[in-house]
């Protein structure tokens, strides 16, 4: 019975693909929760991916700007990137085998392709308190809530008998407090930029810059999985990029800091650092499993420690200038 259902399901998808894309599917294999691998008799395989309503606008926007370093979906018979099927939006894109490129090389290349995406799509926009207040109020509420939960958890440890394990967590907590202090300092600087109505470049950001979202095809490099992309500030892409690849042995000073500090404004670098710490704090999963909490605090401590190591020169320079 199950085999019959699977066969019927395949036939439905096969008809959908052939009718809308003139592609004859020989098989349809689960690839991820959102994608299926389409195997064809021609040897040119494809990915079928469920997506969002506004993806078509994103690909049209990038195509109109002439972006050539992204993998575009195949056009259907109606000359659209996205097709409706059973109340779901789908697109089909060429499938390429993952290349055996070392992570250090892929990290450098991914940053380069993100920079190309940003440069092609940038346009100036003035920061305004009215447009920025809601975003910062929301981020501040999220941080305040998480710091409150962390403080309550630490107090619960301190009120009980202190053990070697609880001391381990307590010894890591001070770095989280350092991050809190740094977030407040950076937020004040960013708010000053906003109050000054500073003009900054907005770009199309990938918004999910992982190494697996960079493909190598016959010597060329392409970005994929731009479904969550949006117009924003490049600092967000670079913050997610840094957090995702912080443990890879590459020169962060060369590939990120110099890029952000070469701009006319400190806003990009400040916002990048703010977002990195924001991600670190938000991802701490507070739960009732004591040994899991030891792991959570260890991970947070190591990440924040590395943050201050990577960005300490800039921070010290700023503080010294303020003293002078």
Residue map of PLM features:
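Active-site acidic catalytic loop and adjacent metal/ATP-binding pocket
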Residues: 35-39, 73, 184-236
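ATP-dependent phospho-/nucleotidyl transfer catalytic cores
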Residues: 129-204, 310
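Gram-positive cell-envelope targeting signals
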Residues: 1-4, 9, 58, 66, ...
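Active-site activation/catalytic loop segments of kinase-like enzymes and analogous catalytic loops
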Residues: 234-265, 276-310
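Charge-rich, low-complexity terminal tails
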Residues: 181-184, 298-324
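ATP-binding pocket architecture of kinase catalytic cores
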Residues: 41-129
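A glycine-centered beta->alpha junction motif in the catalytic cores
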Residues: 88-102, 151-156, 280-299
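Juxta-kinase regulatory segment immediately upstream of eukaryotic protein kinase catalytic domains
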Residues: 1-25
